[in-house]
Amino acid sequence: MTRLTLALDVMGGDFGPSVTVPAALQALNSNSQLTLLLVGDPDAITPLLAKADFEQRSRLQIIPAQSVIASDARPAQAIRSSRGSSMRVALELVKEGRAQACVSAGNTGALMGLAKLLLKPIEGIERPALVTVLPHQQKGKTVVLDLGANVDCDSTMLVQFAVMGAVLAEEVVGIANPRVALLNIGEEEMKGLGSIRDAAAVLKTLPSLNYIGYLEANELLTGKTDVLVCDGFTGNVTLKTMEGVVRMFLSLLKSQGEGKKRSWWLLLLKRWLQKSLARRFSHLNPDQYNGACLLGLRGSVIKSHGAANQRAFSVAIEQAVQAVQRQIPQRIAARLESLYPAGFELPESDSDVNARQQSGTNGHD
C-alpha cells in the first residue's frame, strides 16, 4: 500500500479537537501507511496526544492555524475572513500538494466555497456536490447527491450531479450501468418543481445514462435506484430525517422492555432478538457511513457531520483514504472526458433557454 497524507481540520465541528484528535489516533492504528497533518491550535491539540506512542507521533504533524470558522458563520463572510483558519489551511495543504485530501467537520457553506476557490472544479462542472454512499435493504449501495452543498439547484446542476453520480457508482462502487433517478414528490412526469422536470427532460436525451425517472423519499433505502439526485436542501433534510429514524430505531432495540419484570426465558428471548435485529440493521447506523465527498473538485475533500463522535469522524478519515486510493477526482474527470470528448456540454432545458433569451445572451457564461 502506498503511503498517503491527509490534512485534518481538527478545530471544526461541534466538539473540535476532543473528538477529532482521538479519531485521528484511531485512524493511525487502523492504517500503518497513513500520515496525518493536524491543523489547528497547538495548545488545544498537544494535550490530547499524551497517549500517542512513538510510532503514532512519527506519523503526526501539527500545523498551526490562527482561527476557526464558526459553524453559524455566513459562508460569504467566512470565506472573506478565512485566511489563517484551520479549514483554509487544511485545504491549502491539499492545493500545495503536501496532503492528498482534506477532512473537515466545519461550516458546510464555507468548506464548499473555499474548496471551489482553492482546488477548482473539474472542467465543465458548475458547482461541486456533497455525495455519500448509503446502504439499502437489498444489501447493496445507493449514491446520493447533493446533501447540502447547494441549497438552490437549477436543472443544469441536477443533470451534472446525475452524470457525476453515475460515474462514481460505476467507477468506484462497481455498479455496471447504474440506474439514475431524481428525488421527487411523485412518480408522475408532471409532478415536482420546474427544475426537476427540466432536468428529467434532459436526462432522457443522454444515451450514456441509465435514467429511470422519479423516486419518492420513502423508497430511498429500497434499492430501486443506484444513484439518487436532488438539490442540497432536499438531500440534507432527507438524509438527516433518515438518520434520526435509524438512530431512534436502534435505540429502541437496546432499551425495549427495560425496567419491566419478565420471566427468565422472555428476557433471554428479548436479548436474542435485540442482538439479532441489531446485527441485521447495524449497517444502517449513521456512524458507519459518516463523511460526504465534495464531488466535482480537482482534489479530494470529505465533509464530516458537525455532530460526529470519535467513531464517526474516524469513518470520515477512512472515506478520505478511499477517495485518494481510488483516485475519485481523476477517474471522474477522465470518464467525463471519454463520455463528452468535445467538452461537458449538456443539452439546455426549456427554462434554461428561456432564461438565456430573457437575459439577452447567446450562450453559456
From Swiss-Prot:
UniProt keyword terms in alphabetical order? Cytoplasm, Lipid biosynthesis, Lipid metabolism, Phospholipid biosynthesis, Phospholipid metabolism, Transferase
What catalytic reaction does the record list? a fatty acyl-[ACP] + phosphate = an acyl phosphate + holo-[ACP]
GO molecular function list: phosphate:acyl-[acyl carrier protein] acyltransferase activity
InterPro entries reported in the protein's UniProt record: FA_synthesis, Phospholipid_synth_PlsX-like
Q: Give the UniProt subcellular location, in the record's own words.
A: Cytoplasm
Question: Known EC number(s)?
Answer: 2.3.1.274
UniProt entry tagged with the keyword Cytoplasm? yes
> According to its record, what are the GO cellular component terms?
cytoplasm
Pfam short name (any one) = FA_synthesis
Q: Which GO terms describe its biological process?
A: fatty acid biosynthetic process; phospholipid biosynthetic process
Question: Which pathway, per its entry?
Answer: Lipid metabolism; phospholipid metabolism
Show the HAMAP family listed in the entry: PlsX (MF_00019)
Q: Which family does it belong to?
A: Belongs to the PlsX family.
Q: How does it assemble?
A: Homodimer. Probably interacts with PlsY.
Q: Which NCBIfam families match?
A: plsX (TIGR00182)
Cite the PANTHER family for this sequence.
FATTY ACID/PHOSPHOLIPID SYNTHESIS PROTEIN PLSX, PHOSPHATE ACYLTRANSFERASE
The molecule here is called: Phosphate acyltransferase
